Amino acid sequence: MVLAKSMSKPGPRAMIKLKRVLRYFEGTMHIGITYSEDSEDGEMLTAYVDSDHAGDLDTGYSTTGVALYFAGGPVDWMSTKQTVVAISTVEAEYVAMSKACLMVIHFRNLLTSINQQQVQATNIFEDNQGAVSLSKGSKITPRTKHIDIKFHHVRSLVAKGVVDVKYVETDLQRADILTKSLGAVKFLKNRLLLLGV
């Protein structure tokens, strides 16, 4: 994402970053995604969602990361800046969860169109317990009343049994790599998680 920001006015620093990315691609050509119906989740769609709270120091916006898995490997993923300034980590994660739900709905519809209908709720894995609780609550509380109503469709999908939001430890959060820069050791571990290895 850092490299993408410099595309409008690329300079020498952007070229150095680009060369580093190209060297990374050359050195990792042997790494890939493997799909298998014998995977842990079989042919169940699952999603991992994460957010960094106010990661953009210039604007205060958070970054959303979502990874969708099917047959043991990622089939869709995204990393994007949120369009609202979240005043808490719970809000940032909940906004990210809203984006994940939209992706899940789209992919469930796609699977239905090819006769792979998802009967059970799609598991969405989130590493913020407050956001998990918020998604399952039916009341708007004083702590959450400021959150824009457009994000509360998450609760509706949970109530209908379309999605089931579950807590996952941060160390096992596959979407973490999509929200922030990580150190070398954590990056290598998260890369394997993201690929479903």
Residue ranges and their predicted role:
Residues 47-90:
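RNase H-like nuclease fold core
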Residues 14, 26, 61, 100-103, ...:
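Active-site-proximal structural scaffolding
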Residues 27-31, 54, 74-77, 106, ...:
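Conserved helix-loop functional segments at active or binding sites
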Residues 6, 40, 44, 80-197:
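RNase H-like nuclease module associated with reverse transcription
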Residues 23-49, 116-118:
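Structured nucleic-acid-interacting core domains from mobile-element enzymes and related host factors
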Residues 1-33, 169, 178-179:
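C-terminal reverse transcriptase regions that engage the nucleic-acid substrate
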Residues 19, 30, 44, 62-67:
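Short glycine-rich loop/turn motifs
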